[in-house]
């Protein structure tokens, strides 16, 4: 089993963890309906980049 040769200081430990935070997903707003959706995904009502690409139940 690997054993560290020297103890990692709290400063070095925290610098190592500096990028472990969570980021919010990137969202976009559909131009025609104003609905928010994930980037590069269709909106819940079937629009993508201003065009209807999927038929939904309320059509």
From Swiss-Prot:
Organism, as annotated: Polynucleobacter necessarius subsp. necessarius (strain STIR1)
Pfam families with a match to the protein in the record: Ribosomal_L32p
NCBIfam families per record: rpmF_bact
Gene name of the record: rpmF
GO terms classed as biological process: translation
HAMAP family referenced in this protein's UniProt entry, alphabetically: Ribosomal_bL32 (MF_00340)
One Gene Ontology term, aspect cellular component: large ribosomal subunit
Protein name from the UniProt record: Large ribosomal subunit protein bL32
KW Ribonucleoprotein (keyword) present: yes
Keyword Ribonucleoprotein included in the entry's annotation: yes
Molecular function terms from GO: structural constituent of ribosome
């Amino acid at each position: 089993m690997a054993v560290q040769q020297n103890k990692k200081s709290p400063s070095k430990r925290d610098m190592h963890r500096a990028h472990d935070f969570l980021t919010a997903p990137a969202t976009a707003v559909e131009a025609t309906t104003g609905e928010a959706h994930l980037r590069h995904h269709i909106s819940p009502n079937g629009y993508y980049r201003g065009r209807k690409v999927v038929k939904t139940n309320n059509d």
